[in-house]
Regions:
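Residues at the C-termini of beta-strands that transition into short coil/loop
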Residues: 23-25, 71, 101
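SF2 helicase motor core recognition
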Residues: 6-11, 32, 46-71, 75-94
Length: 133
């Protein structure tokens, strides 16, 4: 199931007004509207659909209590940056990160590689960087 199919499924289940999208083809105006709607506690928007490549830098998503990754890339920095969009100054609640991983797929290999990168970075830095995946 591709991202657009997932967006359609969520929209169908919870209503179009509850979902915003933020990805490479999203215009600058639509991106700004998506963030504003998601961050507004009075808004009906409850689901922000994006990817680490486009949501990793320069945005705040502190209204998120749960972040779900349908897919990952091998770039650890982008993953950590995308996590930090929800967990930053202004966040008043804990944030849960969930990875959907189909067994015996490239996603499983990518998450394993990300875990290894975290382990290596922790050894080099002399501390635990993150406890996620």
């Amino acid at each position: 199931m591709c991202i657009r199919d997932r967006v359609k499924a969520i929209s169908k289940e919870y209503g179009d007004e509850t979902v915003v999208q933020y990805y490479g083809a999203t215009s600058s105006d639509d991106r700004a509207k998506a963030i504003k709607s998601f961050q507004d506690p009075k808004s009906k928007v409850k689901y922000f659909i994006g990817n680490p490549q486009t949501t990793g830098y320069g945005i705040t998503l502190t209204e998120a209590g749960t972040v779900v990754y349908f897919s990952n890339g091998y770039d650890l920095e982008k993953r950590l940056q995308s996590e930090d969009r929800a967990h930053r100054i202004g966040q008043k609640k804990s944030v849960t990160y969930v990875d959907f991983i189909a067994p015996k797929t490239v996603d499983e290999k990518i998450v394993k590689a990300l875990r290894n990168k975290i382990d290596i970075a922790s050894q080099v830095m002399g501390e635990e960087l993150k406890e996620w995946i």
